[in-house]
Amino acid sequence: MTTKADYTEEEWNELVQAPITAGLMVMMSDAHVTSMMGEMKGMMNGMINQPLPEGAQELVGSLIEDIKAKSENKEKMEQPDMKGKDPETVMADMLGQLGSVASLLDEKCPEDEATGFKQWIMGVAETTAEAGREGGFLGIGSVRVSDKEKAAMQKISQTLGLTE
């Protein structure tokens, strides 16, 4: 099992950013002002409240503690650079970041720990998608997870190496 001490500061920041990146990808895939606040809350709840994954409990637990500490200290979390970029470019950059995290986990972690961490990231993406309702009018005809969000989650899963 790996711990925070096994990672450089840059690597650790990549790991901290990964669940946020996955959540933002889902939110951007089918962005609606009315659902964005719920999805942001869902992303935070997904990071902090979902069960710790088997095999990666220590690593994810340490990461959650860092996220909580930054939040309590009102430290600004890194945001993807979106200035002057079209949404497709931003999404491609985010997938690249998640691919880098997947490679880092595969390189440094035992397989069960890497898989557990990746599944936790997917759990954050799923919780984000399920937190808002998409489409419809005043909630009528809306769906919990849109097709665009499902497509984004599929790309995330493939990039993390969880599905082909």
Where in the sequence are the language-model features?
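Small-residue-enriched hydrophobic alpha-helices in membranes
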Residues: 1-164
